[in-house]
Structure formats: C-alpha cells, structure tokens
Amino acid sequence: MAGRNIEKMASIDAQLRQLVPAKVSEDDKLVEYDALLLDRFLDILQDLHGEDLRETVQELYELSAEYEGKREPSKLEELGSVLTSLDPGDSIVISKAFSHMLNLANLAEEVQIAHRRRIKKLKKGDFVDESSATTESDIEETFKRLVSDLGKSPEEIFDALKNQTVDLVLTAHPTQSVRRSLLQKHGRIRDCLAQLYAKDITPDDKQELDESLQREIQAAFRTDEIRRTPPTPQDEMRAGMSYFHETIWKGVPKFLRRVDTALKNIGIDERVPYNAPLIQFSSWMGGDRDGNPRVTPEVTRDVCLLARMMAANLYYNQIENLMFELSMWRCTDEFRVRADELHRNSRKDAAKHYIEFWKTIPPTEPYRVILGDVRDKLYHTRERSRQLLSNGISDIPEEATFTNVEQFLEPLELCYRSLCSCGDSPIADGSLLDFLRQVSTFGLSLVRLDIRQESERHTDVLDAITKHLDIGSSYRDWSEEGRQEWLLAELSGKRPLFGPDLPKTEEISDVLDTFKVISELPSDCFGAYIISMATSPSDVLAVELLQRECHVKNPLRVVPLFEKLADLEAAPAAVARLFSIDWYKNRINGKQEVMIGYSDSGKDAGRLSAAWELYKAQEELVKVAKKYGVKLTMFHGRGGTVGRGGGPTHLAILSQPPDTVNGSLRVTVQGEVIEQSFGEAHLCFRTLQRFTAATLEHGMNPPISPKPEWRALLDEMAVVATEEYRSVVFQEPRFVEYFRLATPELEYGRMNIGSRPSKRKPSGGIESLRAIPWIFAWTQTRFHLPVWLGFGAAFRYAIKKDVRNLHMLQDMYKQWPFFRVTIDLIEMVFAKGDPGIAALYDKLLVSEDLWAFGEKLRANFDETKNLVLQTAGHKDLLEGDPYLKQRLRLRDSYITTLNVCQAYTLKRIRDANYNVTLRPHISKEIMQSSKSAQELVKLNPTSEYAPGLEDTLILTMKGIAAGLQNTG
C-alpha cells in the first residue's frame, strides 16, 4: 500500500468528520446520513471484493482529502501512481466504487433537504443552488406576502391565478447520464434512509430497514452503470413518461388542493376551477428532430400513440375507484334520464372482462351507470391506441372511444353538477374533482408533443417545390422580401403547390411526411411547431404554407426559436414584420409564442453577453407585441447547467424583465433536471409550487427595471466580454486543438446517454458541436470555461474605466435581481471548479507548446473569480450559502479521485507509448476467478482500446457528472 501503515489510516467516517464543516444548523444530519450510507457500502465492497480493495479505496480517498485541504499538485501525482498501477478489472471496480459513493452522497443530501423542509426551520434567503433554495416560493407564503406586504386583494390574486399558465416542456436532451434501472434503486435507498431516521421507529423496523438499505445499495453497485447501446427516441420518451406514472399524475391534483387551501387561508372560499390551465405539460421526446436523424415521422407517430395509450390506461386504472366512491342514488332529473337511457342500452355480457362492477349496474346507482360507460370508452380508447401502435390498424370503431377531451369531460361534469345540486358538494369536491383536474391537465394525450425542425430543412423543401414548378431562380437564392411576397401570395391562394410527382430526396420526404403525420393524428396530440435557427419572417410563413399544403386541419402554432446573439438582436424586428402582415395577424388570433435559446447563445458569445442579450431581447419583443396588440408568451429553452441557462427555478423566473411573464410561461425541463424536479413525490410538489408561485409573483410584484446607467455599463461590458470570449474560442488558431486534448470531448459520444448525435455536422469546429457536449467536456475537467470566460475582461474594463464603477456594480448586485442571479450562479460554478485539476489534464494530455495557453486561461479563471467576489462583496465563495458550501466540500474528495483516474485513463487511451507497471490483482472476486479481469472487461468486448480502459473512462464521466450534479 505504497508503504502506508493501514492501521494508522483514519477511517473514512473520521475523515468525513474532519473534512466537513461543523453542523450548519441544529437540524443538519447530512454527515450522519452520508457516513451511514458509506459505512454500509464499504462493508459490501469488502464482502464482495476483499479487504485489500477496501483499503485501496480508503487510501485514494485520503490522498484526495489531503489534496483538497492543501491543493498540492504532488498529491494528484500520488493519486495517479496508485490508480495507474491497478489492473483493468480493479480499475473498473474502483472507478465504479467512487461513482457509486457520489450517488450515495447525493441521496444523503436529498434526504437531508427533505428533512430540513419538513421541520420548517429553513432560514429565508436567496440561495443560488436549487436544492439549498428556501421555500420562498411556497404558495401559501407567496399569497400572504402579496396581501400583507404589497396590499393586493385576495380577489386580485384569485383572478390572476385562474388565468395563469405554466407549461413545463420535458425534453430528452442527452443530459441524463444515470440509467433508469439505477434511478429506481436510488429512489428506494432514499426511502429507506428517510424511514431509518423517522421518529418512533421500532427496533424490528429499524433492523428490517437496514437490511433493505444494504440490499438496495448492493443491487445498485452490482448493476452495470453503462448503457451498452444508445437509447432510441422511443426509449427516451418512455423514460420521460415514467415520471407521469410515478409522481406527476397524482402530484398535480395534490398540488391544486394545496392551492385551494392557501386561497382559503387568505379568505377566498372558492376552489381553483378544475379547467383553469394552471399547470400544463408538453414534450419534445420524439418530436425534436433538430439535428437528430433518428427522430423520423414514424417515431413521432409512435410516441403520440404511446402517450395516448398511457393516458387512457392511467384514467382507466382510476375509474373503478371513482365508481366505488360515487355510490349515491340521489341525482338530478337530467342525470337520471341519461343514466336510465344508458342502463336500457347496456348489454348483459358487456362487462365480463372487468374485475369490479362486471355485472349490469342497477339503475339505483346512477353515477356508477354513467361512470361505467366512461370506463367502457376508456377501455376502447386504450385498446384502439394499442392496436394502432402495434399493427397500424384497429378493429375498434372510433365512435366507441373518446376522440376529444370535451367528450371525456362531459359525463364527468354532469356527475359534478348533479352531486352539487343534490347537496353533495363535499363528495363532488373529493376524488371526482381530482379526476376532472387530471383530465383538464393531461387531456387524452398525456402531454402535447412539440415538433422542432431547423429552418434550413423547410428552405430545402420550398427550394425543391419552386424548382419543380420552374418559377425563375431557386427559392434559396431569393431575397427575404421576395420569399415573403411569394409565400403570402400562395397562402392567400387556393391552388395546391405540388402533387405526388414532386422529386424528393430522403430529407425532403422526411419533412413532408412529418407534416402528414401531424395531419393524420388527433390535433390534441400536438403543441407548437418550433423552428430552430430562425432568423426572419419567411421562416415562419414557410411552415404555415407547408402545414396548409399537407392538409393539417388544425394548424400548429408556429414558434420561431432565436438562439445566436445576432438572431436575438434581430428578433424584435423580425417579429414586428410578421405582426405587420395582415394575413399573419388574422391567423394568430392575438397570440404569439417566441422561444429564446440559452444554450447556443451562450456557446456563441459567452454567458454574460448571452444573459444580457436574452434580457434585452425579451424587453424589446414585449414592446413589439404591445404595439400590435398581441399577447406574447416567452418560451425559455434553459438547460440544466449554468452554461446553458440553468439555475434555481424561482430565481430564474423572478429575475426576468418586467412584463415578460404576464401569467404565461413555457420552459424546458431537460434530461437530468427531470429527475431532480419530478423524481420523488415531494420534489414534484415543490417544482409545481415554485413555478406557480414565482410566475404569480412576477406578474403581481414585477422586479425593478435597471437604471439607465446600469444598462449603459452592462452594454459596454457585454461587448468586451463577447470580444474576449470569441477571441479565445473562435479566433485563437489552436483553441479547438487545445479543447480536444484537454477535455474528454472526443470520447463523450461513448457514454450513450442520448439518441441525438453530439454534432450537428460530422466534421467542423466548435460551431458544429452541440451545446451539451461543449459544456459537458469542460464540466468534466472542473474548469467550466464557457460559463466564466469573458466576465473577467468585462469587470476589468469597467473598473479600469472608472473606479466608481465597482460601487455601481455592487449596487447592481444588491438591487437588481437579474444581475444578482447572474453573479451568484457564476460564483457557484467557481465553487465547483478547480484549476489545479484542469492543470493535471493539461500536463498529461496537452502538447507542451500549448501549456502556456492553458496557464493563461487558469490565470484568467483566478482573476475572474476574485472580481466576481469583489462585486458580490464576499470574502469567500458561497459564504452566503453554507448548506451548498458544506455539500460541495463533502463531494470534492470523491470527485478528485475520479478526475485523476479520468485524466490518467485518457493518457493511456491516447498515448500508445505511455507505459504503466501493474500490481497484482487486489479484488478478491477477481482473484478467485480463473478468467481474471475478463469477468468485468467482457461487458465491453468490442472496445477498440486496451481491456478495461473504456469502461473505466465512462464510469469516471458518470461519477463526475453525478458529483457536480449537472452534466450538459
């Protein structure tokens, strides 16, 4: 053991207690939870792989802890020498163990956060971390604050709430790096841990829970963390839909009941109407074809039918409970007539395939008669979707099913009105109200699927059409004015543009067949048609024309997505031009949605300039909409990471410009963030509460507008920030070479975490790289360059220009929510960063003539960090958020081991001349096997690298992603 005296080594438990700050508060059980999980895991590790392997884990942990304490690079080299001496099988076990320990640390944190919330001792404040963030978006507290502090009347709050909509759009962006098999086991570990620390637990319960905990920890460790094949879009959709089944379905009515209670507590004796569109759900899974050739028209059709089948099944599973509950015989005359008619027409043998209420329901139970008919239709709706999905045809006639949500709501509303008329309102407001709210929220399609496609693909189709029609030069070469004129002439006319003889490439067929699928499926399957890389009005008009040509009876609303900096700047003028077109103004009926992209704008210009440009673009778009009398909904394409616009929900909403939310908000919930938002019932409740409360508060108590001098300063700073960012990322001739050497970007695709390719085009530089792998690669090395690059130059410029600007920046931080959130998020990223780790990657992987470039970037990191602290008035990082600070310190030592393992593994993969001396196997399980390391290595028999290296690398990627709690 490298000459160490194991007996003298501190146990990991003791190390933890030395490493972590003292309790942050009286209710702080984090270290206790973490130590228990770790203790159980290390015992399991020893049972499975022997004492030597456990001791190696402890040695690595101790070296990491020593590095974290003093930041001495020599400790990283010591770690490297231990890690590179491991044989392939041991290397996989060790990297898997550290990845597993980080997942356990995350679970301990989640249980601690839930514990702190339960006992309501949470200090109020603006925490920058989602899970540290306080309950200031508690719906009841928000109502009370609006009434008592801001003088709003309860009626004003009720009116605003009834007309408010938050639409959460689940996307399958490949950022969920944890397999579903593991997520489920993690959920059970979380449950066991929470119950173990519950009050009044008996010794027997405790023993059984402890056994369950150990079983689940072992099951998670013995599960292969690595996806051996990439998920298909259908896999992603099923994974996304599983959250509806597990938490969202029951979470929505539960949350709406809490809203009712909160309203009652401010004097409103009415419930939120069941059809108030307070919460809506949409999805991109199977609809987002932007750069993803695997999302075909057939995939879109399949996911729509699958979602309809799942929705019908969820209703069907609930309807019998409702039939049990509504056993009353009193009803209105109108209701009795309907029930008697249904009873007369019912067949005696029609219900044999049901478990409950399988005989003819007597007319003395009228509610059950009506609900029995609803059950029949739900059964047929589900089976018809199943048959269409499996065979493409169904023998169940459409009239035997529910074809639209109004048909479904009608008998339920009839039941509700009848119960209320007969004095049974308390019964009507029970499970029936919950059911009505579910139908209003989820409809028959569970979620509405957005379609997203690149503007260029529509141009290709119209180019083919104009060439086929032989109309002068090709559409692609026309001016914007020429395109608009022709598109409007066609939209105003009636003649079909093309027939079956149109010559089509595969790409053109794909676009047209997608519109065909939209025309064939029920219109409530779909939400918006989003055009990515939109730049001009013709992009929107082109989609309107293609919808008409492909016979879409209820055209989807068309949403331009503005992403790059130049497109954001030009967006208000493009939208104004659209609104000035009479045909278009009549088409939209006073409503327009515009999507703004956080990821690509950040990759294009850096975080500071992107954030400020997004802010200004929203202000200008709102002015344009007001001028033309259009209600504008902003759709925020935020990622999970700060580099892609992520951050705590309530702060993100409250820092938007005044008048840009107006009770209507759409926002993406991406990959890994879905699990953090909806993975557990209490997380689902918290997410719905935060979005609803913050949207209401933004409308009723808008944030302040920035002072003119703040704007002027930030305008200048943004120019400087963009210049520095682009001078490094796009103009430095060897930057791409440095990026590919210093990070695991080239190896990212091996993780199989999504169906979408990591590049828009197979070759090319940073421009062609998607925002997710771009951020992911820098996150892995803990350097986070895309987030902070440009900030330092901007702050330096401002202070150098006038020393008083520092005071102005500090005032902006104190008074302006947008600026505060921007700075706080950067501060959090610095707390998660470590230039010493990035330096190790450089030393091992980057050619010597680029070392000076890396050193210059790291000096920039340190200078930028100090300037951010100065602006925030902080001496240390995260001094205002002790909980997050504690949690990061707890994770750092695990992450450091994985970083060192990753850097040395990349060295072994990339450098054929790098030789290491392996020590004998240390894992007991491997020693007892005649097949040696092949037992673990055979899981990946096709790897092009030396045995075990690829799996070790992927495990380190997953572990670091888990430790930093955001991937891409």
UniProtKB/Swiss-Prot annotation:
Main location per the UniProt record: cytoplasm
Localisation per UniProt entry: Cytoplasm
EC number: 4.1.1.31
Necessary cofactors: Mg(2+)
Modified residues (Phosphoserine): 11, 705
GO biological processes: carbon fixation; photosynthesis; tricarboxylic acid cycle
Active-site residues annotated for this sequence: 173, 603
Pfam families: PEPcase (PF00311)
Summary of the tissues where the protein is detected: Expressed in roots and siliques, and to a lower extent in stems, leaves and flowers.
Assigned keywords, A-Z: Allosteric enzyme, Carbon dioxide fixation, Cytoplasm, Lyase, Magnesium, Phosphoprotein, Photosynthesis
GO molecular function: phosphoenolpyruvate carboxylase activity
GO cellular component, one term: cytosol
Role of this protein: Through the carboxylation of phosphoenolpyruvate (PEP) it forms oxaloacetate, a four-carbon dicarboxylic acid source for the tricarboxylic acid cycle.
Assembly with partners or alone: Homotetramer.
Database matches in NCBIfam families: PRK00009.1
Protein name: Phosphoenolpyruvate carboxylase 3
Source organism of the structure: Arabidopsis thaliana
